[in-house]
Amino acid sequence: MSASALSSIRFPGSISEYLQVASVLSLLLLLFKTAQLYLHRQWLLSSTQQFPSPPSHWLFGHKILKDQDLQDILTRIKNFPSACPQWLWGSKVRIQVYDPDYMKLILGRSDPKAHGSYRFLAPWIGRGLLLLDGQTWFQHRRMLTPAFHYDILKPYTEIMADSVHVMLDKWEQIVGQDSTLEIFQHITLMTLDTIMKCAFSHEGSVQLDRKYKSYIQAVEDLNNLFFLRVRNIFHQNDIIYRVSSNGCLANSACQLAHDHTDQVIKSRRSQLQDEEELEKLKKKRRLDFLDILLFARMENGKSLSDKDLRAEVDTFMFEGHDTTASGISWIFYALATNPEHQQRCRKEIQSLLGDGASITWNDLDKMPYTTMCIKEALRIYPPVPSVSRELSSPVTFPDGRSLPKGIHVMLSFYGLHHNPTVWPNPEVFDPSRFAPGSSRHSHSFLPFSGGARNCIGKQFAMNELKVAVALTLLRFELLPDPTRVPIPIPRIVLKSKNGIHLHLKKLQ
């Protein structure tokens, strides 16, 4: 082709023309996205019109005060029966549910976890039992259920007691006459110690090894970062989040958590190379949690992939210690602020255990009043404040109101447990609510969720709560610190904004 021919071909004359084209395309894309969001918002408004809510801003939704969510839902319960929409921003809404009939209906269905928020947990805990849905979830649940058979749980009582005694020995050394102790961190180490020994065949004490504090801190950071991300409209995008300061912190915390679980798996695999250890394993009637995973065969005959294995370990490592730490900490606070009930529990335990040098599986069912107090504390302070579902099909509730497929439903256990139409005087600590023979709705008390997707380790957790309460009350009187009243805040588990500080008075 000649030079004259080439010169006759017209190319864009300047960079400004490129910018003009790019600007037009960007504007068209923005208009398309705006229209898309507008239509989605109109669909959401139409879908939730049967459920009144407080006034909301068209763009910012309801004003969410990050650490006042629990107080906010108590206000909603008074003004909006059974359920209420909460707009996170203009094009995202969730229906908060706090009615037992609504709970029963939703928990009896097979709706998946709400993808929008739970997906933010995947980089940390992978797609284990908490995040799985459908047939894969069912296979994993069936595979892991034997790890919580009573034959497995029985010998754990002694292990739990040993871990509690280590914590109490530390408390005796560090508490002074007039000092207070922030108990949550100590209890978290203790519950991690317990789950490591019971479920992961760990030898040694987590509580006496300083290196495990980095894992505890990583879990704390990931809890907070998850909560912050759910409420930040810009951080819904994975690319934006990865380059943000919070995204970098989350990545570092994930790496710390994964290093911990990788070491646990590696250590157990190494132990199982020893023939003597394998022989001991063959003599067991049932395998514990990690050994089930290591020897598991799925329906296709294949063992779990390393990715699936670590996801289940990460999931249960977190759920098996952080939720119970929350439960025990708040139970101790509830007993500290209700000394007459604390003393009655102590007398019951003293008559059963004497000096408390040991506690057995059979003892756990012989402390009825203590169990009533534990349940009442779990009602007021549920370890998991809420769970979410995304409706896979339309639903009609008992009162005739309905929601279409695709709506995000948040089951607020905190709201349910503080609903005055379900629990009269809900803020009053009254263990008699759980007295034998007392009647209540089957779905009015859900500290471990309900339905097919209830907490797989609920019996393990309840046993640990009983052991911790019994042994602690035999050695200490729990007293509140009136200058530092804990402020409950919703994270993945129920935490306190300012810690849980108690006076610990050693009993003679």
From Swiss-Prot:
Give one Pfam family, short name only: p450
Which keywords fit this entry according to its UniProt record? Endoplasmic reticulum, Heme, Iron, Membrane, Metal-binding, Microsome, Monooxygenase, Oxidoreductase, Signal
Q: What is its EC number?
A: 1.14.14.1
Which reaction does this enzyme catalyse, per its entry? an organic molecule + reduced [NADPH--hemoprotein reductase] + O2 = an alcohol + oxidized [NADPH--hemoprotein reductase] + H2O + H(+); dodecanoate + reduced [NADPH--hemoprotein reductase] + O2 = 11-hydroxydodecanoate + oxidized [NADPH--hemoprotein reductase] + H2O + H(+); dodecanoate + reduced [NADPH--hemoprotein reductase] + O2 = 12-hydroxydodecanoate + oxidized [NADPH--hemoprotein reductase] + H2O + H(+); (5Z,8Z,11Z,14Z)-eicosatetraenoate + reduced [NADPH--hemoprotein reductase] + O2 = 18-hydroxy-(5Z,8Z,11Z,14Z)-eicosatetraenoate + oxidized [NADPH--hemoprotein reductase] + H2O + H(+)
Q: Which residues form the signal peptide?
A: 1-37
GO terms in the biological process aspect are: omega-hydroxylase P450 pathway
The subcellular localization recorded is: Endoplasmic reticulum membrane; Microsome membrane
Per the entry, which co-factors are needed? heme
The membrane topology of this protein is: Peripheral membrane protein
Q: In which pathway does it act?
A: Lipid metabolism; fatty acid metabolism
**Superkingdom of the source species:** Eukaryota
- Cross-referenced InterPro entries: Cyt_P450, Cyt_P450_CS, Cyt_P450_E_grp-I, Cyt_P450_sf, Cytochrome_P450_Monoox
Any one GO CC term of the record: endoplasmic reticulum membrane
UniProt lists the family membership as follows: Belongs to the cytochrome P450 family.
Q: What is this protein called?
A: Cytochrome P450 4A12B
